[in-house]
Amino acid sequence: QIQYHKVVKGETLESISRKRGVTIAQICKLNHITKKMKLRPGQILRYS
């Protein structure tokens, strides 16, 4: 099942990966982004 995370101000890929129990690489692959991309509050990310 696909799950989503809504980015809030101050979050990073690292903090989201820890919170959701997935790797940064998994988040990047599912969302077609790179580690260096800036996240925006309100952005929706898939994480599983």
Which residue ranges define each predicted feature?
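Primarily a LysM-type cell-wall glycan-binding module
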Residues: 1-29, 40-47
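Short, small/polar residue-rich loop motifs at catalytic or cofactor-binding pockets
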Residues: 32
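Short, surface-exposed secondary-structure edge patches
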Residues: 35-37
